[in-house]
Amino acid sequence: MIDQTAFIHPSSIVEDGAIIGAGVHIGPFCYIGSQVEIGAGTVLKSHVVVNGVTKIGRDNEIYQFTSIGEVNQDLKYAGEPTRVEIGDRNRIRESVTIHRGTSQGGGLTKVGSDNLLMINTHIAHDCVVGNRCILANNATLGGHVSVDDFAIIGGMTAVHQFCIIGAHVMVGGCSGVAQDVPPYVVAQGNHATPFGLNIEGLKRRGFEKETLHAIRNAYKLLYRSGKTLDEVKPEIEALAAEHPAVQAFTDFFARSTRGIIR
C-alpha cells in the first residue's frame, strides 16, 4: 500500500505488498522489498536498498548506498523470517549496513530513535541500538551488541559480538572493544580501557553536581579501589539507593556477560 502523498522516483522499484506512509520520498534507483514498511515523512535519498521484514519509523533521513534488512553474515543463518526495526528521526548516512537478526539471537535487529549513523557504519545481526546514539564513520558492531542510550562510538572502532556499550559512554576512535563498557565511562584503545567519565557529556544532558559526584564515587569504587567487581557491588548498590543515576551501574552489572573493561 502506497500513500497517495508519497513520492517514488520512476527509476525506483517498490515491490507489491510494501507499505509506504504519507509524505515518504523515495529518490532515484532505490529498491523496496515486499515486506517493508516505511513510516510517514521518511526520505530515501537515492540508491537505497530496504529488504526483508523491515519496519522503518517516521521522519528518518536515509542516504545513498545504504542497505537495510539484507541477509546477515552469520553462517548459521538459513533464511528464517527475522526482522529489522528502526525508530523515528534517525539520520542514516551513506553506505550504512543494518542486517536482519537470527533465530538464535531473538530474530530482531533494532535501532531506536534520534540516532546519527555516520558513513559506513555497520550494525550486524541481533544488535540493539538505543536512542540518541552517535556511531561515527566506519564504526562496526559485531552480532548481538547492545548500545545503550546517548552512547557515542568513535570512527573506525570495532565492537566485539555480544558486548554491551552502556548509556552515556564515549568510545574513542580506532578502538577495539572486547568487553562490556559500563555506563558514563570514556574508553579508548585496543583493547579498550577506561579513561575516566564522560563528564562533559553528562553536564550537557543536565546531570546535577550532586549526581555527578555520586557517579564519580561509583567509578572510583569500580576502578580505583583495588577491589574486585564482586567486592564493590554491594558498595555501589548502597550508593544507588541514595542516588538513582548510580543504579545504571548495578543494572549494567546484571546484564554483563563478557566482563567489564579494565
Curated annotation (Swiss-Prot):
Compartments, record wording: Cytoplasm
GO MF term set: acyl-[acyl-carrier-protein]-UDP-N-acetylglucosamine O-acyltransferase activity
SUPFAM superfamilies membership: Trimeric LpxA-like enzymes
GO terms of biological process kind: lipid A biosynthetic process
EC identifiers of the protein: 2.3.1.129
HAMAP family, alphabetized: LpxA
Function, in words: Involved in the biosynthesis of lipid A, a phosphorylated glycolipid that anchors the lipopolysaccharide to the outer membrane of the cell.
Similarity-based family: Belongs to the transferase hexapeptide repeat family. LpxA subfamily.
Protein name: Acyl-[acyl-carrier-protein]--UDP-N-acetylglucosamine O-acyltransferase
Organism: Pectobacterium atrosepticum (strain SCRI 1043 / ATCC BAA-672) (Erwinia carotovora subsp. atroseptica)
Lineage of the organism: Bacteria, Pseudomonadati, Pseudomonadota, Gammaproteobacteria, Enterobacterales
